[in-house]
Amino acid sequence: MTSTVAHGAGSAGPADDVEPMSARTYQVRTYGCQMNVHDSERMAGLLEAAGYRRAAEGTDADVVVFNTCAVRENADNKLYGNLSHLAPRKRTSPDMQIAVGGCLAQKDRDALLRKAPWVDVVFGTHNIGSLPALLDRARHNRVAQVEIAEALQQFPSSLPSARESAYAAWVSISVGCNNTCTFCIVPSLRGKEIDRSPADILAEVQSLVDTGVVEITLLGQNVNAYGVSFADPALPRNRGAFAELLRACGDIDGLERVRFTSPHPAEFTDDVIEAMAQTPNVCPALHMPLQSGSDRVLRAMRRSYRAERYLGIIERVRAAMPHAAITTDLIVGFPGETEQDFAATLDVVRQARFSAAFTFQYSKRPGTPAAELDGQLPKAVVQERYERLVELQEQISLEGNRAIVGQRVELLVATGEGRKDTLTARMSGRARDGRLVHFRAGDGPVRPGDIVTVEVTDAAPHHLIADGGILAHRRTRAGDAHADGQTVRGIGLGMPGIGRPVVPVAAEATSCGSAGGCGSADGAGSSAGDPQ
């Protein structure tokens, strides 16, 4: 669907009255999941290929692009609040442009312009490649452009990219989701699952490694559903395809770390566990959403597994990788959840001993089956349960982290992970299991992207401390690339911290299929991965 809508709050002037394209700057603001971060890097790449340049830190951009999330009401409110903050500037600088894309744009469509008529471009999840052309059209025709495609026009990974990191990268293996979780709106916005061919994925990984990347994260709403038959999509999918992909990543020289997010417990198979344990560069870390420990609630959520199966997967993972860090997503206050149901969740959390959990309060989202269910719970009840769950998980996380004190860990040095690093004279990095470690680098020239070995000296629920100095330091091509300024740093809003090499401003996680996947939850999410 494509439409044009006249502006109500000022618009760009005629083409010959507008500054040259080469002078125009952009800023991309990202809300939501890792898939949105991946897509935002593509939006930035498209804009740079079209002649835009990234706005310098602390300056006003000529074009501001919002890549939105639709999973929670507070994500809606945050977007419209930020759009309102830009309205005065739009009135005084009509040549400035505002574009809104992503899941909320796909959902709200023309309603978005009714709420924020000063927006210039609205585009959806299926046509991000149209962004530069839509900006040009809005700028020259002086009318807002709304273009929402109903099917994927071009796989985002095939588009130009301006990555946030020189040392770590997202690699999408699929888009869309075939699950029907009752609380989740994402399948209706991103469509049915579409897989990339293994050859395309591995070619992208190789090209990233060739530029210095040492860590990749394979992305999908449900990565272990990967495996459509590319020869004949009507044939049964290859249920071993994801494990085969992990093993193939292990054959790429120079690729030191492989992560993935997120698997669905209903389709998690033992061949994936074997591939993780037997492939040296696949990290001993698993983020697998639980959502609830109550079988009755899981049934109402249409999650297609029960607590016993979930705990069985964890048991087999730990048997193969005793030191694996397992993290999860949990929703509190799903419609009809009783105290007995919630007690079952607490019991599973105690048994699972998660390293971290992203915990959320259920948020009623129009258009989802759960929004029509009876038994919507009072806010006070949900809040009280949420606080109990957070307290329990904080205790478990702290106990797990204290058990690592005195151990040596290998870190991929990161930038932006520790908000207090400047004050504490520390740097930060991620261990192979995804844990965040703040360490003292001393006077050595340690760079983001380098690999260091440190000994853990202290622990907190959300991070580890290593104040004993660096025991080993390996300079990498990734560190060289970072030092050479080959990375473009985006602006992120709303990203969880587990497993990410870069933590954005105002970290805030989403739920469902991933650590930043597709759930519908509200309130402050809690995790053991927040930067300190």
From Swiss-Prot:
* Catalytic reactions of this protein: N(6)-dimethylallyladenosine(37) in tRNA + (sulfur carrier)-SH + AH2 + 2 S-adenosyl-L-methionine = 2-methylsulfanyl-N(6)-dimethylallyladenosine(37) in tRNA + (sulfur carrier)-H + 5'-deoxyadenosine + L-methionine + A + S-adenosyl-L-homocysteine + 2 H(+)
Q: What is its main location?
A: cytoplasm
Q: Which residues bind [4Fe-4S] cluster 1?
A: C33, C69, C103
For whether the record's keyword set contains Cell membrane, the answer is no
Q: Could you tell me what the cofactor note in this record states?
A: Binds 2 [4Fe-4S] clusters. One cluster is coordinated with 3 cysteines and an exchangeable S-adenosyl-L-methionine.
Listed as disulfide-bonded, the cysteine pairs are none
Q: Which cofactor does it need?
A: [4Fe-4S] cluster
Using the UniProt annotation, give all residue ranges assigned to the region (Disordered). Answer: 1-21, 510-532
| Keywords assigned by UniProt, alphabetized | 4Fe-4S, Cytoplasm, Iron, Iron-sulfur, Metal-binding, S-adenosyl-L-methionine, Transferase, tRNA processing
Any one cellular-component term (Gene Ontology): cytosol
> Sorted alphabetically, which Gene3D superfamilies does this protein's record hold?
Methylthiotransferase, N-terminal domain, tm_1862 like domain
| Compositional bias segments (type: Low complexity) | 523-532
PROSITE patterns, per the entry: MTTASE_N (PS51449), MTTASE_RADICAL (PS01278), RADICAL_SAM (PS51918), TRAM (PS50926)
What GO MF terms are annotated? 4 iron, 4 sulfur cluster binding; metal ion binding; N6-isopentenyladenosine methylthiotransferase activity
| Taxonomic superkingdom | Bacteria
Domain Radical SAM core, residue spans: 163-399
Where does this protein hold [4Fe-4S] cluster 2? Answer: C177, C181, C184
Q: Where in the cell does this protein reside?
A: Cytoplasm
Which InterPro entries would you find in this protein's record? Elp3/MiaA/NifB-like_rSAM, Methylthiotransferase, Methylthiotransferase_CS, Methylthiotransferase_N, Methylthiotransferase_N_sf, MiaB_methiolase, rSAM, rSAM_horseshoe
For this protein, the record's SUPFAM superfamilies field holds: Radical SAM enzymes (SSF102114)
Q: What is its EC number?
A: 2.8.4.3
- UniProt similarity note: Belongs to the methylthiotransferase family. MiaB subfamily.
Instruction: Tell me which HAMAP family the record gives.
Output: tRNA_metthiotr_MiaB (MF_01864)
Q: What binding partners and quaternary form does the record give?
A: Monomer.
Function statement: Catalyzes the methylthiolation of N6-(dimethylallyl)adenosine (i(6)A), leading to the formation of 2-methylthio-N6-(dimethylallyl)adenosine (ms(2)i(6)A) at position 37 in tRNAs that read codons beginning with uridine.
**Name recorded for this polypeptide:** tRNA-2-methylthio-N(6)-dimethylallyladenosine synthase
Give the species. Mycobacterium ulcerans (strain Agy99)
Name of encoding gene:
miaB
